[in-house]
Amino acid sequence: MKLKHFLIKRINIWENAELIESNTIEFDKTFRVYFENLQEAREINMILPIFSKMYIDIILESLIENDATLTLITNKRILDLINENDADNAFDSLIKEGRIQAILADYDLEMFFTSCDNFSSLFLFFDKMLFDDSEMLLIKDEENIKNAKNMFNHLERLAKSQFPLKH
């Protein structure tokens, strides 16, 4: 099942989400809001369809500072880029400590979805392959955070059934 189809069936969890938009004055607003929320998370679940050193750095920083855990669904290309750019071996060390569980998906990841204990967020792509970080849907209410976690758990089972990553 494609991720888009799965998401459409569960779109109601996003109906009360706040739309965070960057603009010419606050060009980094979505990144800043994402980072502020991620800094408070202790349990992070993520579908990561892109490689961005900036995002990887804030994810690793949050994991280290909060003694947090990460379940990461990504593809081989992104995982290879993360490992190639892991100069201080933080990513590899966190995997060895059991604080990062990486799952490789063999299908297109068409969204950047984060489900944490304190928030959930969704970034989409513009025109199929262009990642749009100027807009983000943000969930902060407890009930929809729980629903987003359930959605992530389903997507995790789907990814594991297709191509689990073993370390």
Residue map of PLM features:
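PLD/PLD-like phosphodiesterase catalytic module centered on the HKD motif
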Residues: 1-11, 55-167
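PLD-like (HKD) phosphodiesterase/transphosphatidyltransferase domain
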Residues: 1-72
